[in-house]
Structure formats: C-alpha cells, structure tokens
C-alpha cells in the first residue's frame, strides 16, 4: 500500500503540473478524479503513509486560530512608479549611465497580493504575505489550498520565491453571484476578494475560492544570471509563470509592448494594473542596488486610470488625525474599475479653488492608483448656474475656527480637544500598521470615546472588562478578545508605537529608520533636531516635526503613562550605532572583491553605520573599489569622492 500511495501521489502531481503550469492537460478530468478517489481511500485506510506533497492536502479545510507574524529573511521592497514615457526614459538614462549595454525584461504587473514562498529540500515550509516588507503573516495553510502552488518542487532545492496571488475575473464573478444570492456583501473587486481569501481562518473557504498565482522572483541567491532565466527555472520547478514578457534593450520596444498589453488588458482572464520593467542582468541588479524604498534596477509603469462622468450632489468635510479637514464629494453612482463609486475625494480647499469645483457640477471621476476615487476636473460644457462652493470657516466637529497656513494646501483644525481629531488618532493608534489592536476599529473607538472611557492613546491600556461590557453590542467574549489584543500590543517593537503616535511626517518606515539609531522611544525626548536630520533617508522637515512633538510636556507625560502601562519602548530590530566608524556615510561598492563576497561586505558596512547604495553621485561619501572596477570608480575620481580598497574595509 505504501508503494501504491507513492505512485498515485507522484502521478497526480505530474498531472497537476501539466494542467496548471504547462497549460497542457495530459489526462481527462474523469480519469484524474478516479485516481484521486483511489488515493483518498488508501490514505484513509493507511494514514501513516500520507505523503507531505499529497494532492489530497489541497482539499477540505482547517479552522485556523489566527496568523503568526513572520519575519522575511529577504525583505520585500516596493517598486518606483512611473506614469509616463518620460519617466521610463529617465529610468533608462540612469541605468544606461552605469551599464550602457543593459537589457530589460518587461513583465505584467498582476493586480493581486504579494506572497513569499520558502522551500527546504524541495518541500514547502512557509507561505507568507508581504506585510510591511520586513514582517508579514504566516499563511502557509491557506497557501497550500492554492492549486497551482507546488507542495514539492521538481528538484530538492532550498529556495525562497516571490509572486502574486490573484483571483480570476471568472472566479470573482461566480463568488459575487453566490454572495448576492446568500444576502452577503459583495466584494468590491478581484484584488479585495483575493486579499480577504488569503486571510480566511477557514482553509476550506480558501480552497473553494480558486485563487491562482504567478511567480516572478527568486529572492534567495540563485545560480541564474538573467531575470528571464529565473522565470524559466521557476516554470521548470513547477510554478505558474506569466507568459507575457518582452526582452529588449530598447525603451521604444518596451513602450510598444506596454501599449499592446494595455490594448488587450480587458481580454485577459485576470486584472493587471501596469507593466514592470527590470534590468535583466542579476549582476547589474546587484550593482545598482536599492534606495530606502525600492530597487534602482526596476520601475513599474502604471496604466492611466479609467475615467467616468458623475454629478456632485453634496460635499462632506471630515477631520483627520492631524487636524486636516478633507472634503469628500457625494456623487451620482458610477461604475469605475469594476466597482460602484458614489464618493470621491476633492483633496483640499486649494484643489477646489484651482479646479473651480461646485455642487451640481458634472465632473470627471477616476481612481488614483486604481484605488482611491478622486475628482479630476469639471466638465464646464455641462455647467448651468451652480454657485461657488462655500468653504467652512469652523471645524465641522468641534466648531473651533479653522486655519489655512500659507505653506499648506489644506484647512486644519488646531484644537487638541477636537472630538474627531482625538477619535481619528485613537483609530490610527489601534490600526494594523501601528499597534495592531485587533477588533478595536472605528465603531468601538467611537463608542469608547463617547462613553468617556478614552481621551488619549494611553487610556486604551487602562480599559477594563467592565468598560467594554457597558458598550452597546459588546458581550463578555468580545470584551475578553479586545483586552487580549490590547495586552498583546504592549510587546510590539517600538517602531509600531512611534508610528502609532501619529506624529506628522512620521510614517512606518521613517519610524523604523529613527529607532534603528535611537533604539528607544524615551531617547527621543532629548533627541536633537540636527542629529535626527543626519539619519539617512530623513531630513530637516521630519527632524523638525519629531523634535517639536517630543519637546511638548504632554509628550513626556504620554510616554511615561505608556511605559507605566507596560508598553514596550525598545526597538527589537538591529540597532545602528551612532558612534560607529561609518555612521551616516553613503557608501558604494564596485569591482570584484577577493576576500569578502558582496553580501558580506554590505553587511559589514551597514553594521558600521553606513548606507550602501548602487550608484555614485554627489551624495556619495565613500567608494570601496575592488579589482576591475569600472565606470563607478572613474566617476568617483571625477567627483573627488574618497576611495578605499577591500583591505581597508576588512581592517575596520
């Protein structure tokens, strides 16, 4: 029986590979089902012989308790966006300045969810979401329910690969039809449906929704030399690889490819939102390196947003967590990029004045980045006698006078006791990217605030079960879950807390950069503006905003209250030593290193406080030159940049 189970497992996996990867079925559905049922029967009789890569592990479901955090061994970076031919030409010019003979691989930008898959000796070990690029969620059990992801590779490799999980338009339509029949809320678009599916706790639901994937990157070190070779290897290993791509050194040919794909975009079985252009040589990719946010060797061209006409019925003004008052237009409903849109942002008062937007106007509505509906401009030919829009002078929440600073485009409420400002701040603090207090969403925050239980973020950690039980709709079990989530948030790394404080200009990535240097929230109470401005990737605006916040007496009180409540103040990642030999310096590696490999050299430089980049510019402080160094070394000499060799680096 053990031998027969192994035979059936191998045979069915090969049939699945032919069907999903090669798109060339080698057996009829009825024959496949017959063999599959035989395997199920044998495994039920002899469960001790069930193999890890058995296709039966794709069927049925498990109720998961939740998703654990997963730190990526290889960070996932965002891509620089481009919206015009000129931006692509500028990218080409930057690359060709370093590598005149560079070629590019243009691939479709799938509108799905980024996933990372790690295999050991050919077996799938971890499937994870992108998260913030450094820490995602372990969704391995759900990943195993996606039929075109192999549980076992065709070779016993230890490898980490990247790709996109998506939902086809056909599956999306079927799911929404079923949800409509069941009286359930329909998904807005395939991407939202895929995102919701990957975070399902019931793996049987994941299996039914028929997600699919396209893989495009080997994140771990590879023996391949070119990106197109990587795609070929991924296909050979059993992954689904998108068949549409263009290899060329010509930006004209890439532009023609983009226009061809854009024209047939609606004919594809899945959603795409652009084309990604990558330097094809992996060695050149390594030389070009990364900025803080994105690789220098790739760029994502985003398709122009779909546009529709709609009438503005009214305008709502809402207060955000920093006091900014944002206008939102209520519209006659229109279908836009697969969703019904009835509200769109008007950005700010300067935008309203510039575009002369009035209630009753017919306007052009589009989705900014295919996500946020926005008003582009007014169709003046359809304007009648609409009056100029009245701009509020008082805060719609607290009634205090609004201010319009000369250097800002927005109205702002500066009353620190404004109810909306406080509520939005509390919501932000509890949000996933900040303290990630599961369940503490806007509705419950509003109830807590109106009941007088919370007035600032520190109050969250003083809440009791009795407080929650007094709220309408909160039962004992829900109260226990909320308290558990609040308690769990105390152990977050400090960059989550810093971001959660809602300081202007301090996003999640900036928070991490700051705490890599300072290590502790308490240290920011005495941090100097000029010191913060020296941190690579920041600058004077961020430094000023941070110091102004922590110079307030209320900030010291808040930090003390949070610390007393047991909230972690320490950064759990690797701290940068501000006294390190190369702290704050921008360094470029070039040429062949004889004693260290490039990753070892980069790790050492970063441990010494340096930022390692891929190109030489006026901002470069130091170049480490190995043998056969080329254009980067010559450019460094012409700019008068300090140059050292590998021996010098090894001795530090």
Swiss-Prot record:
It catalyses: NAD(+) + (deoxyribonucleotide)n-3'-hydroxyl + 5'-phospho-(deoxyribonucleotide)m = (deoxyribonucleotide)n+m + AMP + beta-nicotinamide D-nucleotide. NAD(+) binds at residues 29-33, 78-79, 107, 130, 164, 278, 302. InterPro entries: BRCT_dom (IPR001357), BRCT_dom_sf (IPR036420), DisA/LigA_HHH (IPR041663), DNA_ligase (IPR001679), DNA_ligase_AS (IPR018239), DNA_ligase_CS (IPR033136), DNAligase_adenylation (IPR013839), DNAligase_N (IPR013840). Its EC number is 6.5.1.2. Keywords: DNA damage, DNA repair, DNA replication, Ligase, Magnesium, Manganese, Metal-binding, NAD, Zinc. One of its GO terms (molecular function) is DNA ligase (NAD+) activity. DNA ligase that catalyzes the formation of phosphodiester linkages between 5'-phosphoryl and 3'-hydroxyl groups in double-stranded DNA using NAD as a coenzyme and as the energy source for the reaction. It is essential for DNA replication and repair of damaged DNA. This is DNA ligase. It comes from Streptococcus pyogenes serotype M28 (strain MGAS6180).
């Amino acid at each position: 029986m053990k031998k027969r189970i192994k035979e059936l497992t191998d045979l069915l996996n090969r049939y699945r590979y032919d069907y999903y990867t090669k798109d060339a079925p080698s057996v009829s559905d009825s024959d496949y089902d017959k063999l599959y049922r035989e395997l199920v029967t044998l495994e039920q009789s002899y469960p001790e012989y069930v193999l890890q890569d058995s296709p039966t592990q794709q069927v049925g479901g498990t109720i998961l308790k939740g998703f654990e955090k997963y730190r990526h061994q290889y960070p996932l970076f965002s891509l620089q966006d481009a919206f015009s031919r000129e931006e692509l030409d500028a990218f080409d010019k930057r690359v060709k300045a370093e590598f005149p003979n560079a070629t590019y691989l243009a691939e479709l930008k799938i509108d799905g969810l980024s996933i990372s898959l790690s295999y050991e000796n050919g077996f799938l070990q971890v499937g994870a979401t992108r998260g913030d690029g450094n820490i995602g969620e372990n969704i391995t059990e759900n990943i195993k329910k996606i039929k075109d992801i192999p549980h076992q590779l065709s070779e016993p490799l230890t490898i980490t690969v990247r790709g996109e999980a998506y939902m086809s338009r056909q599956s999306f339509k079927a799911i929404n039809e079923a949800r409509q029949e069941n009286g359930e809320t329909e998904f807005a678009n395939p991407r939202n449906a895929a995102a919701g599916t990957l975070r399902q706790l019931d793996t049987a639901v994941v299996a039914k929704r028929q997600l699919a994937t396209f893989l495009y990157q080997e994140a771990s070190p590879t023996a391949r030399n070119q990106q197109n070779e990587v795609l070929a290897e991924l296909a050979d290993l059993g992954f689904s690889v998108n068949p549409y791509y263009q290899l060329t050194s010509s930006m004209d040919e890439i532009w023609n490819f983009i226009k061809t794909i854009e024209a047939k975009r609606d004919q594809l079985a899945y959603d795409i939102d652009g084309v990604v252009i990558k330097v094809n040589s992996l060695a050149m990719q390594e030389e070009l390196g990364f900025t803080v946010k994105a690789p220098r060797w790739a760029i994502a061209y985003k398709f122009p947003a779909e546009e529709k006409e709609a009438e503005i019925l009214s305008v709502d003004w809402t207060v955000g967590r920093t006091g900014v008052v944002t206008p939102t237009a209520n519209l006659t409903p229109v279908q836009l990029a697969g969703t019904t849109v009835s509200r769109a942002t008007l950005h700010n008062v300067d935008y309203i004045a510039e575009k002369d937007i009035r209630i009753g106007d017919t306007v052009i509505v589009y989705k900014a980045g295919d996500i946020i509906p926005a008003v582009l401009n007014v169709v003046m030919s359809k304007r009648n006698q609409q009056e100029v829009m009245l701009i509020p002078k008082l805060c719609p929440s607290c009634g205090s006078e609004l201010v319009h600073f000369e250097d800002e485009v927005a109205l702002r409420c500066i009353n620190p006791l404004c109810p909306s400002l406080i509520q939005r701040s509390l919501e932000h603090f509890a949000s996933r990217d900040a303290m990630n207090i599961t369940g503490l969403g806007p509705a419950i925050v509003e109830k807590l605030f109106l009941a007088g239980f919370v007035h600032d973020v520190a109050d969250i950690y003083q809440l009791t079960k009795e407080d929650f039980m007094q709220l309408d709709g909160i039962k004992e079990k829900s109260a226990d879950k909320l308290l558990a989530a609040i308690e769990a948030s105390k152990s977050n790394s400090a960059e989550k807390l810093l971001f959660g404080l809602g300081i202007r200009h301090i996003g999640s990535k900036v928070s991490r950069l700051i705490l890599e240097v300072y290590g502790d929230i308490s240290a920011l109470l005495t941090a100097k503006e000029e010191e913060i401005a020296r941190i690579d990737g920041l600058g004077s605006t961020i430094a000023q905003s941070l110091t102004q916040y922590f110079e307030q007496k209320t900030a010291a009180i808040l930090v003390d209250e949070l610390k007393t409540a047991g909230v972690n103040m320490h950064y759990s990642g690797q701290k940068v030593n501000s006294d390190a030999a190369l702290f704050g310096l921008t360094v470029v590696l070039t040429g062949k290193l004889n004693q260290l490999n490039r990753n070892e050299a980069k790790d050492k430089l970063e441990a010494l406080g340096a930022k390692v980049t891929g190109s030489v510019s006026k901002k470069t402080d130091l170049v480490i030159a190995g043998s056969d160094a080329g254009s980067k070394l010559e450019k460094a000499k012409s700019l008068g940049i300090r140059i050292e060799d590998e021996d010098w680096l090894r001795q530090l």
